[in-house]
């Protein structure tokens, strides 16, 4: 007994030592967050009330914290009126990708340690009381894409410092909706990509880049005119005065007087080697005295001969300058108009006239964002007072409806019934979802055909195509549904591949947020229709929600990546050819189950027993593609374009054959009207 009592403490400490590494990551992350909490002097809304030592093992449930696989990926405390200083210890969050602290009252400077983030992509410090200089260490952040600093109190030489930072990411310094030169520079360096504004991500218009280049081109063109060379002396002087890189200097003691033909204005500051001109009024050339009026009967003198020659030249140069300015301005204006028209025609959805038959009321309004806005009353009639429920999900319900033309629709309505529960962030996510879905427009996709938003009574809805034959999951695993033969399954595989290829090929690429057999619906002729979750807002909007699982598929703040869809497509093909669930308690994941057959090339053993026939050549190619799609390293996986091309070489199903043979009426009308509009 004594021996046991003697060894027990050592055994106890051994257990603790083994468990320590498991919580080390959480402890280090929690310590960094608690040090940030200690620097917050005022928390009027109690946002950080659940940030405490006792809950350090549950830090993924702390307000504003979003985790993926137990690692802090996002810290979003925007708009909580927090006061204090920024904690340099946040740089210890090595997996942090987004740090959003905008619209608070943080003071002091930006810690130089923020340049040591390894994976940080977004640093948003807008509308605080930060001051001092931007630390040059921020240039060390190789992964930083968006740096937002407007609405602070940085020193005047901030622009000089920020120029030294890398121009591979976008910088936002001003509140003005106009882009600052630095922001424009950043955008041009990124091939006119997306720049970050105060409230949203906006597309930099190509017109601005064209105007930027026209200025330099027109300047070189005008140098051919002598009058322009005379007038540019004062213009250059003013430009130099406005450059922030020219530091203030005292006026030179013996500043040369300007040429007689140029009138300069006094300026309170000077620029480097160009002294400011003071007391300009005293340096103006004397006015030409008036010519006395001639006596009656006497011949009028030739006034032009009495005027100085330089006055003639001055008037002439002014007239030439005026004509040149008008000509150049007209030319630039014409180019801007042409560029705007070209840009709008390229970026915007083609203008389509209202449907001519079968639709009434709001459905006949012109398109605004690619889809029409509908009335609740019209949808209520179509869905029989919202009594025809297809399915209820976590956060939204899907109803079936029929329009007056006979077209069947599916209406997804959020479960939130009061406007006070619908936050601003939810509204932004809702509109972003509409914008995203409205741009896909593929015949193997469950397309968005309308939306409804009203506040009295409150509702937010999306209207989709209706696929009457249920989901692929039901046909593969429910014995009561109709059996799918080998040809039907191959058509579903190809239709799905073409749809994902289209989504990944968009600009910017769009990846499916949760790709699986339950998100693939079938039409009357068993063509595949890929659907997207309309209201998946909880993970984005609930700061206490812990996000787990595959980062690429479940995180909404961090957009999904196409490589994750490629992996899911490989799992889907296994599910289609084998008829087995993607996960089962019996055999685990379908990948583990299939690995032994894929390694030994014993492919026939994987075939669904309910299939009477199958094509061995197609099966071999499918299994080759599956091996590529399921590779652990994302970079080694093929693109969906390569996947579709490889499958198409053996499976003779073109995109036209993979689409529904009987398109819904609204698709047919849309195609007719599109051809008429063009």
UniProtKB/Swiss-Prot annotation:
LRR repeats: 71-94, 95-117, 119-141, 143-164
Keywords, comma-separated and alphabetical: ATP-binding, Glycoprotein, Kinase, Leucine-rich repeat, Membrane, Nucleotide-binding, Receptor, Repeat, Serine/threonine-protein kinase, Signal, Transferase, Transmembrane, Transmembrane helix
Molecular function (Gene Ontology), one example: ATP binding
Record field: compositional bias (Polar residues): 296-311
BP GO annotations: root hair cell differentiation
SUPFAM superfamilies reported for this sequence: L domain-like, Protein kinase-like (PK-like)
Tissue localization of expression: Expressed in pollen tubes and seedlings.
Physiological role: Involved in the pollen tube perception of the female signal by binding an unidentified female attractant. May be involved in the regulation of root hairs development.
EC number(s) per entry: 2.7.11.1
Similarity section: Belongs to the protein kinase superfamily. Ser/Thr protein kinase family.
Signal peptide (from-to): 1-25
Description of the deletion phenotype: Short straight root hairs.
Region spans: Disordered: 247-314
Topological domain spans for side Cytoplasmic: 345-678
Catalytic activity from the UniProt record: L-seryl-[protein] + ATP = O-phospho-L-seryl-[protein] + ADP + H(+); L-threonyl-[protein] + ATP = O-phospho-L-threonyl-[protein] + ADP + H(+)
Protein name: Protein MALE DISCOVERER 2
Bilayer disposition of the protein: Single-pass type I membrane protein
């Amino acid at each position: 007994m004594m021996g046991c009592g003697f060894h027990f403490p050592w055994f106890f400490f051994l257990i603790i030592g083994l468990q320590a590494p498991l919580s080390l990551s959480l402890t280090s992350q929690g310590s960094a967050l608690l040090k940030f909490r200690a620097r917050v002097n005022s928390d009027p809304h109690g946002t950080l009330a659940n940030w405490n030592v006792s809950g350090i093992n549950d830090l993924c449930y702390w307000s504003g914290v979003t985790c993926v696989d137990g690692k802090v990926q996002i810290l979003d405390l925007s708009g909580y009126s927090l006061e204090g200083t920024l904690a340099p210890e946040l740089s210890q969050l090595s997996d942090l990708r987004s740090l959003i602290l905008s619209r608070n009252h943080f003071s002091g400077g930006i810690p130089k340690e923020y340049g040591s983030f390894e994976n940080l992509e977004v640093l948003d410090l807008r509308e605080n009381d930060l001051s001092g200089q931007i630390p040059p260490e921020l240039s060390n952040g190789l992964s930083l894409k968006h740096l937002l600093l407007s609405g602070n109190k940085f020193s005047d030489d901030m622009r000089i410092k920020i120029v030294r930072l890398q121009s591979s990411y976008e910088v936002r310094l001003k509140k003005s909706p106009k882009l600052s030169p630095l922001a424009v520079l950043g955008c041009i360096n990124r091939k006119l990509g997306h720049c970050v504004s105060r409230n949203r991500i906006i597309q930099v218009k190509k017109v601005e880049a064209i105007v930027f280049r026209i200025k330099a081109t027109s300047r070189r063109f005008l140098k051919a005119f002598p009058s322009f060379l005379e007038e540019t002396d004062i213009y250059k002087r003013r430009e130099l005065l406005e450059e922030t890189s020219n530091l203030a200097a005292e006026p030179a003691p013996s500043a040369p007087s300007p040429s007689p033909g140029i009138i300069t204005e006094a300026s309170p500051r000077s620029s480097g080697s160009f002294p400011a001109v003071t007391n300009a009024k005293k340096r103006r050339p004397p006015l030409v005295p008036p010519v006395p009026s001639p006596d009656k009967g006497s011949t009028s003198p030739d006034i032009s001969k009495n005027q100085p020659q330089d006055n003639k030249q001055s008037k002439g140069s002014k007239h030439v300058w005026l004509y040149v300015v008008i000509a150049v301005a007209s030319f630039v204006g014409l180019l801007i108009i042409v560029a705007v028209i070209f840009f709008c025609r390229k970026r915007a959805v083609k203008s389509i006239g209202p449907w001519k038959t079968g639709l009434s009321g709001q459905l006949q309004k012109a398109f605004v964002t690619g889809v029409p806005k509908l009335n609740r009353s019209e949808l209520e009639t179509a869905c029989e007072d919202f009594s025809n429920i297809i399915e209820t999900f976590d956060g939204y319900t899907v109803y079936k409806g029929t329009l007056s033309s006979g077209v069947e629709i599916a209406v997804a309505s959020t479960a939130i019934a009061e406007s006070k529960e619908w936050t601003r962030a939810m509204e932004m996510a809702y509109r972003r979802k509409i914008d995203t879905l409205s741009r896909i427009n593929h015949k193997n996709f469950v397309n968005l055909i309308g939306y409804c938003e009203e506040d009295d009574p409150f509702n937010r809805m999306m209207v989709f195509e209706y696929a009457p034959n249920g989901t692929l999951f039901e046909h593969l695993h429910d014995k009561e549904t109709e059996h799918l033969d080998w040809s039907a399954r191959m058509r579903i595989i190809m239709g799905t591949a073409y749809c994902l290829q289209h989504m990944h090929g968009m600009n910017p690429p769009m990846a499916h947020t949760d790709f699986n057999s339950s998100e693939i619906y079938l039409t009357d002729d068993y063509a595949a229709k890929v659907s997207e979750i309309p209201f998946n807002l909880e993970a984005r909007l609930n700061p206490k929600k812990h996000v787990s699982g595959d980062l690429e598929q479940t995180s909404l703040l961090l957009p999904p990546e196409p490589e994750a869809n490629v992996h899911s497509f490989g799992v889907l093909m296994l599910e289609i050819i084998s008829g087995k669930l993607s996960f089962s308690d019996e055999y685990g994941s379908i990948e583990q189950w299939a690995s032994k057959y894929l390694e030994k090339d014993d492919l026939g053993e994987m075939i669904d027993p309910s299939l009477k026939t199958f094509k061995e050549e197609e099966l071999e190619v499918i299994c080759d593609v599956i091996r590529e799609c399921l590779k652990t390293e994302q970079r080694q996986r093929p693109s969906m374009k390569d996947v579709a091309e490889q499958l198409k070489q053996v499976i003779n199903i073109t995109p036209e054959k993979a689409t529904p043979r009987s398109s819904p009426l609204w698709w047919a009308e849309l195609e007719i009207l599109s051809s008429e509009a063009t």
